[in-house]
């Protein structure tokens, strides 16, 4: 196995699941365990100025090998895994020379199949890493960490490769939208950066959703069912009414590309009280604002129907479409496209991110930061997998991008 695979498997063994129901950063202390390991590894391979903050951010510098008046470039990946599916203990499976058929996931009844995921046929003859059906794999985004780490090691061991100063960073809590809450942009010291947090080999992204979180509190009134007529107010049924008043087909399972949605992530309740958690997403700022306005209209309607205060909400913007901040710096995509071409991808696939990245918020904080592929697929669930050859190519991509930046003139 190559080093990038060894590194990934090691990182995947750490339980780093974030938690969306806390108000601290990082949301889970266990993320510190991987952060400490990464800090030590960076130091061991010779990265300079390595540090770990008390908020679980790991930073480091790869010194320049040439004197050039070029921008400082950064590469970032996140340590946490999604709270939407179990991630511990992770037991990866390696499938060598994939034959194009079904892959049984461990001792479970689950099968990773091209009948469900036709693009698996693209990987015939290559080597895949899957989960075992009990947990997610964690390629999102421990593959990105492994690729950045091996890039750093390779460049330090090959000082003959010309490049400017390179910054690396690993962040917590990206999966819950708080990945850069306490990220030190000024201290990081990069002029531009890339997150390595994407999907299939040959893809890159610079458009994200505009995003908001929505928490809905429905207050009912419980009365014995035998004497409930004209008295009971069932919060569960009102909550269902709320959800039914949102567009039925503006949901994740019915949308793709630039189509936005409302997503009911979870719901808990009884007659007296019900709580629903949503995310709201759209690439268009105008439609995004219209979605939030619709929520307020539904709340007003239900409160008029059932009594003021029956439905209360907390709605907060999470991040915005980073395209606005990337468009003035499209040379970032041009450089990546040149690197892809040298690696056999004449036209990289550029699609909108149907989610967010740390780069979305960093771009609005003055660090333009598009997203690069890792080689993974089917994130946040048991069918997650990654191609080993894609990981190896991504390392080559990062090295080439780093080299190309030496020829960019710093403004």
Where are these regions (language model features)?
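Short glycine-rich, acidic/polar surface loops and turns
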Residues: 261-267, 352-370
